[in-house]
Amino acid sequence: CSCSPVHPQQAFCNADIVIRAKAVNKKEVDSGNDIYGNPIKRIQYEIKQIKMFKGPDQDIEFIYTAPSSAVCGVSLDIGGKKEYLIAGKAEGNGNMHITLCDFIVPWDTLSATQKKSLNHRYQMGCECKITRCPMIPCYISSPDECLWMDWVTEKNINRHQAKFFACIKRSDGSCAWYRGAAPPKQEFLDIEDP
């Protein structure tokens, strides 16, 4: 299973459902057959939803994932102690599906800014595009992009820009990194400016 890293804001924008929840039970279930008629197994987590940040008007009861990490299956702690932020795809009927490529992290590892941004701020930036910079030099190709530099500057994708910044559209239609809750003003120097 391989996936490219995403900024938490991208994960929020790409997901159908974003919730804070804990897993209370786990079992293997059949979910139809593959093209050769073999049964497809999935793991079903029964969860207790604590808060929904994005999604349908109903609580999520079950989360499904593939049976092993080799096929991108996610392993959650059951027992109802550990809380997670879980972003994933809707399956209807109060169910969702997650893979290792989705944004799933223990709630207590999120920064205060990330937790606050889930309520409104990431949504404000969903029209912007976050482009990961794998090596210097890298450039934006349009004004609605923000360069995500964590990998280059700190050799880790879960660093400064991921923890403390959102990429928000300004009044002139361009996008810029911003730390705080109001939309950024034009006079701030963009991070990608030389």
From Swiss-Prot:
Function: Complexes with metalloproteinases (such as collagenases) and irreversibly inactivates them by binding to their catalytic zinc cofactor.
Site (Involved in metalloproteinase-binding): residue numbering on this chain: 14, 35, 41
Gene of this entry: TIMP2
Gene Ontology molecular function, alphabetical: metal ion binding; metalloendopeptidase inhibitor activity; protease binding
Keyword Secreted: yes
Post-translational modification: The activity of TIMP2 is dependent on the presence of disulfide bonds.
Any GO CC annotation of this UniProt entry: extracellular space
Family per record: Belongs to the protease inhibitor I35 (TIMP) family.
Residues where Zn(2+) binds: 1
Alphabetical list of InterPro entries matching this protein: Netrin_domain, TIMP, TIMP-like_OB-fold, TIMP_C, TIMP_CS
Gene3D superfamilies hit by this protein: 2.40.50.120, Tissue inhibitor of metalloproteinase-1. Chain B, domain 1
Subcellular location field: Secreted
PROSITE patterns per UniProt: NTR, TIMP
GO BP terms in the entry: negative regulation of membrane protein ectodomain proteolysis; response to cytokine; response to hormone
Pfam families referenced in this protein's UniProt entry, alphabetically: TIMP
Disulfide bonds: 1-72, 3-101, 13-126, 128-175, 133-138, 146-167
Domain NTR as annotated: residue spans: 1-126
Subunit note: Interacts (via the C-terminal) with MMP2 (via the C-terminal PEX domain); the interaction inhibits the MMP2 activity.
Top-rank taxon: Eukaryota
SUPFAM superfamilies, per database record: TIMP-like
Protein name: Metalloproteinase inhibitor 2
